[in-house]
Regions:
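Catalytic domains of carbohydrate-active enzymes, especially glycoside hydrolases
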Residues: 87-108, 316-322
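Active-site mouth loops of central-metabolism enzymes
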Residues: 73-87, 164-166
Length: 483
């Protein structure tokens, strides 16, 4: 290990780990659960990582969703996860050995309201999640709970058209109120919707919309996220009537880009690209739609259905903290790219993992600094991690590539704190191996704990500590002073 030159983390800093129900829980048909948006994504055997990621970005059609529901041939990894639904007690005890001070996970909407539009919740699901949260607290961790992390009930996608339908606002509001009523006295930190800005990268998982249902997909995406923003504001308003001390956060996947060069066209495109990423957080922290967003909508033939009551609700219900995920930085070249979230160019100065995710610790420092300067709101790092193939040799997994990545990024978190940013938590993504969100693979591993399951669901399910397990334990014990 090495000494962190920016070892100035506050004593109440939350060193944690994060997973999602859709990638970990499994128990696909247990306790009344119905399918959700993640359950219809198959593992695409025989394809390269590049091919898998290309197909994932293409989105889903109604036919693909229905085929997924009826399919008995292919393997759907997220239906099985790592069976965390049944193993959470022992898994949390194992994670607690590292000294985690916080644990982030999500509640599956399709368990609590299996079809999304029921009048009453599923008690079996609520009882399960209450017991899980009790266990998180019992082992000494602060629960950080996400209400929606890519677990939209399939019925709401096929019957209602996903988040483009304003009826879904009230359905989600009912769900959110239900969680707060049952669990609000046990959970201080809530993330209402995971990565709310991923509408152009993952429209199916983010919004539950099928690409063949709309001629203008951008129109559907931004109408969908407007409805999400309204729903978040409604849930936040209700939370504050229950307990003013509840911390209601919004979350984005960091999409900050660099210009390819100092050529003015590159610099301006990067600025425009970044502003449309700040759009989501501008609304939720400044309470208003920025003028540049209205200009963008007009230029792209996007006409939103927005009411004055909704705009007033947004003004009155700004969020308490910003949660971000950060894995890599991005770059734009005006000769090749447009002002669209996935229009990016590889950075020749950075190395990447086998999935093309570029490694840029200073990019995290840059993004944290930009967010802090813009909003002056507490920041919670909800996800940061390094997906890689792990190999067992002589009964051990030597994953120094993971500790190197995480150590370099944690140092940059300390650097942002040194500059004055208020950062309250760092949650390593996937502290125990789970199914990859973007590729449906188990072999894309992030954890400090290895789970013996392969990409096709085979394996003993046994847990094995990697070398990084003791490394992260030492990081926490030293409050980030030793990396």
């Amino acid at each position: 290990m090495r000494t962190n030159q920016y070892a100035n983390f506050p004593k109440d800093f939350l060193w944690g780990g994060a997973i999602a129900a859709s990638q970990a829980d499994g128990a696909y048909t247990v306790d009344g659960k119905q399918p959700n948006s993640s359950d219809v994504q198959p593992y695409l055997k025989g394809l390269s990582n590049e091919e898998i990621q290309f197909l994932e970005k293409q989105g889903m059609t109604v036919a693909m969703v229905k085929e997924g529901l009826a399919d008995t041939t292919h393997f759907y990894p997220k239906r099985h996860g790592i069976d965390f639904y049944h193993t959470y007690e022992s898994d949390l005890e194992l994670l607690a050995e590292m000294g985690l001070k916080a644990f982030r996970t999500s509640i599956d909407w399709s368990r609590v309201f299996p079809n999304g539009d029921e009048n009453t919740p599923n008690e079996a699901a609520l009882a399960h999640y209450e017991k899980m949260i009790d266990k998180i607290r019992a082992v000494g961790m602060e629960p950080i709970i996400t209400m929606l992390h890519y677990e939209m009930p399939i019925n709401l996608t096929l019957t209602y058209g996903g988040w483009t339908n304003k009826a879904v606002i009230s359905l989600f509001e009912r769900y959110g109120k239900c969680l707060l009523d049952r669990l609000g006295h046990k959970v201080k930190y809530w993330i209402v919707i995971n990565q709310i800005n991923m509408i152009q990268i993952e429209p199916w998982l983010s919004l539950g919309i099928c690409k063949d249902q709309y001629e203008n997909m951008a129109q559907a995406e931004y109408q969908g996220v407007h409805n999400q923003l309204v729903a978040v504001a409604k849930v936040r308003a209700y939370a504050k009537t229950l307990d003013a001390e509840l911390q209601m956060g919004t979350m984005v996947a960091d999409g900050t880009v660099y210009p390819y060069s100092c050529r003015p066209d590159d610099v301006v495109l990067a600025m425009q690209h970044n502003r449309m990423q700040y759009f989501f957080t501008d609304v939720q922290f400044r309470g208003e739609y920025p003028k540049f967003a209205w200009n963008y909508f007009k230029e792209n033939q996007i006409s939103l259905e927005v009411t004055e009551d909704e705009l007033q609700l947004l003004r009155e219900n700004t969020m308490d903290y910003l949660a971000i995920s950060y894995y890599f930085s991005q770059m734009v070249d005006a000769t090749k790219n447009t002002n669209k979230a996935d229009a990016i160019t590889p950075n020749p100065y950075l190395e990447a993992n086998p999935w093309g995710w570029e490694i840029d610790p200073q990019g995290l420092y840059n993004s944290l600094s930009q967010y802090w300067d813009r909003y002056q709101k507490p920041i919670l790092i909800a996800e940061n991690g390094f997906g890689m193939y792990d190999k067992i040799e002589a009964g051990k997994i030597q994953d120094d590539y993971r500790t190197s990545y995480l150590g370099d990024h944690i140092e940059q978190v300390g650097r942002a704190i040194y500059d004055g940013a208020e950062i309250i938590a760092y949650c390593a993504w996937g502290p125990i191996d789970i199914v990859s969100c973007s590729s449906q693979q188990m072999s894309k591993r992030y954890g400090f704990i290895y789970v013996d399951i392969d990409d096709e669901g085979n394996g003993t399910r046994k847990r094995l500590k990697k070398e990084s397990f003791n490394w992260y334990k030492s990081v926490i014990e030293s409050d980030g002073a030793q990396l």
